[in-house]
Amino acid sequence: MKASPHRPTKVLIHLGAIRQNIQQMGAHIPQGTLKWAVVKANAYGHGAVAVAKAIQDDVDGFCVSNIDEAIELRQAGLSKPILILGVSEIEAVALAKEYDFTLTVAGLEWIQALLDKEVDLTGLTVHLKIDSGMGRIGFREASEVEQAQDLLQQHGVRVEGIFTHFATADEESDDYFNAQLERFKTILASMKEVPELVHASNSATTLWHVETIFNAVRMGDAMYGLNPSGAVLDLPYDLIPALTLESALVHVKTVPAGACMGYGATYQADSEQVIATVPIGYADGWTRDMQNFSVLVDGQACPIVGRVSMDQITIRLPKLYPLGTKVTLIGSNGDKEITATQVATYRVTINYEVVCLLSDRIPREYY
C-alpha cells in the first residue's frame, strides 16, 4: 500500500528507545550471549531497514521470516548475519548463498527435495529447527536430526546452529515450557556434534527464563518495548515503548441531540455534542472493533463514536478544538498514555498484532 505523507496520521519510532531496550536486556543475560534482533514483518511494523541500521552495532545478527525480508536488508547495506526463521523454497538456496543468508532446515523432506534436484549446497549455512512443542515446523525425533546433520555435512553445508521456539514462555505456568525445554535438551544430548550456536530464547524466555538461555537469544517484541505477555506477567525490568501512533483533527462540528454517526447509524448523540473527524481507519490497521475505545486529545480521553470507517473515525470531544489538534492513538498525550497492550486488550488480541497491522499507508518517522 502506498504511503500517504500528505495527511497528519503518522507512526513515530524512537530508535534510541530500541537501542536502550537491547542494552537493558543485554545487561540481564549471561555475558557473552549473542544477541539476534528479530526484524521480521517490517520490524513488527516499526520499519525493518531503519531499525536494523540503527541497531546494527548493538546486535550480532538479524532474524527475518523469509528470503525477501532478508534481501531487503542486504540491499540496504546491512552486512551482519541474517537468519531466515521460516522454511525457504528450494529456489531460495542459490539466493541464500549469493547474499550470505543462513537458512532454517526443518525437515528431511526439504533436504531430500534439494538432493533430488541436485542443488549445489556447498557453502550454504543452516540452523536446524527443533519442534519441541510449538507444533509448526521442525524436527521432532533425534534420529531425524542426526540423519539431517549427516546429509547436510556430506554435501558441504555448514550446520552452524540449532534452535527451538517456546509456546508458553509468556504464561504464568511453567509446566509446558519445562516439557519443551526437556525435549530440546534430550535432542541436544543425543547429537554426536552439537552445532556452534544453540538458541531457544525468544523475548519472553529472555525476560522470564534467563536460566535457560544457551548461547544466543532472539530479541523480538521486547526489543520494541512491548511486553510479550501482554498484561499476564509484569516485566522484570523497564522497557521503553518505541512506537507512537498519532493523527490530528481535520473536521470539528457541533451536532444536535439525535444526530447519528457512521455506517449503520450505530451511535446517536443523546445531547448537543462536539464531534471531530480523524483521518485513520481500518485500512491503516485501526480496526473496526475499536468503536467506543478512547483516544487522547489535549490529555483527555475522547471516545470513538460510530463505526470505524476505512479511512476515518469520529470522536466525541469535551469542547471545540482547532483543526490540526493532535490526536494520540498509541503513546502519551499530556499526563495520559495509551499502550499497544491496552489496544490489544480491547481487541482481545496481542500487542504484536496491533503494531504489525499498522499499514504501510501510514508514514514512519524516526528520531
From Swiss-Prot:
It catalyses: L-alanine = D-alanine. Pfam families: Ala_racemase_C, Ala_racemase_N. GO terms for biological process: D-alanine biosynthetic process; peptidoglycan biosynthetic process. One of its GO terms (cellular component) is cytosol. One of its GO terms (molecular function) is alanine racemase activity. Pathway: Amino-acid biosynthesis; D-alanine biosynthesis; D-alanine from L-alanine: step 1/1. It is an enzyme of class 5 (isomerase). Its cofactor is pyridoxal 5'-phosphate. SUPFAM superfamilies: Alanine racemase C-terminal domain-like (SSF50621), PLP-binding barrel (SSF51419). SMART domains: Ala_racemase_C. The modification N6-(pyridoxal phosphate)lysine is found at residue 40. The active site is at residues 40, 263. Substrate binds at residues 136, 310. It comes from the Bacteria. Its EC number is 5.1.1.1. Keywords: Isomerase, Pyridoxal phosphate. Catalyzes the interconversion of L-alanine and D-alanine. May also act on other amino acids. Belongs to the alanine racemase family. NCBIfam families: alr (TIGR00492). This is Alanine racemase. It comes from Streptococcus pneumoniae (strain Taiwan19F-14).
